[in-house]
Every structure is written in C-alpha cells, then in structure tokens.
C-alpha cells in the first residue's frame, strides 16, 4: 500500500510539473525568415512568439478568440497601457448587457489585467487577464490573453510599431 501511495504521489507531482512547463514562458527554436522583434501568434497552438533572431524566440502560452471570433493577419502595436481601464466593445456588451460601460484599471473584474498592447486596425489587444485559467484555450472575442506576469515581460520587450502577425 505504501509503495502504491508513493507512486501516486510521484505521478501527481510529475503531472503538476508537466502542466506548469506547458504553462510557462520558454526559449525555443524558431524558423528563419521572420524579422527579429516581430510578435507571431499561432492560434492553433495557442502560443505567442517574440522572435529574437538567430533562430530563437520566446514562447508564451495565450488564450485566443473563440471559434467565429478569431482574426488573422498583420497589425502593429499602437499603444502600451499599464492597468488600463476597459470599455466593453459593442459585441461583448450585447452578449453581456449587465456589464458596466467602463471597468476601472486595476479592478479585479477588469479583464485587461496588468497591461495591454493595443493593436492597429481595430479593437483588439494583447493583454493580461483576470481569468488565468483561460490561458491555453479559445476564450476571447478576438483579443490575445496572457498571464499577467507574461504580459508584463512582453510589455518591456516591445515598442510602439512592433509588428504582430496572427496565423492559424
């Protein structure tokens, strides 16, 4: 019985480590041909890559748009915001009419988390979250959600004008 309990505890521990590793930022190999400094989001992988050059990138786990809410293409970072207030877009407000018109930055109910990188061409952003359990899923209306510690890291590494490419 004692050996079985130890094996179960060891298995549970290994599973927790594997889950944590899948949920962690990491340095990975990345194909050539993408300009260093570019952010690449692969929605099928639910991962965001910051291309560093020399065949390397930082990979972060993310949540992406639900089916029917995803978008693909190229944008650029056009704003950097710490603890941003959030005004629900019309589609979100229509689906959730009880939402207030504005949720203050820093509020636990604010879905933007600790920081946001707004993207050119629309209402989309790469931002933190108040729902960390959604990371790794198809959860949003099109924004890219990151763990708060990851958006804080990415926020420091990118600047206005950074290209962002979203692919399948």
Place the predicted regions along the sequence by residue.
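Conserved interaction-surface patches within small, structured recognition/assembly domains
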Residues: 31-40
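Bacterial N-terminal signal peptides
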Residues: 9-17
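Exported/periplasmic cell-wall-interacting domains
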Residues: 26, 34, 54, 59, ...
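Sec/Tat signal peptide C-region and signal peptidase I cleavage site
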Residues: 19-24
């Amino acid at each position: 019985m004692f050996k079985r309990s130890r094996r179960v505890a060891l298995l549970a521990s290994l599973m927790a480590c594997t889950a944590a590793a899948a949920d962690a930022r990491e340095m990975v190999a990345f194909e050539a041909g993408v300009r260093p400094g570019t952010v690449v989001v692969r929605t099928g992988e639910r991962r965001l890559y910051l291309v560093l050059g020399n065949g390397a990138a930082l990979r972060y786990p993310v949540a992406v748009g639900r089916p029917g809410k995803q978008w693909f293409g190229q944008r650029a970072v056009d704003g950097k915001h710490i603890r941003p207030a959030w005004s629900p877009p019309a589609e979100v407000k229509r689906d959730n009419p009880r939402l207030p018109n504005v949720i203050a930055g820093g509020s636990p109910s604010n879905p933007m988390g600790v920081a946001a990188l707004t993207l050119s061409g629309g209402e989309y952003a790469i931002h933190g979250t108040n729902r960390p359990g959604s990371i790794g899923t198809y959860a949003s209306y099109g924004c890219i959600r990151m763990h708060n510690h990851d958006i804080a890291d990415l926020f420091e590494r990118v600047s206005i004008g950074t290209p962002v490419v979203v692919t399948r």
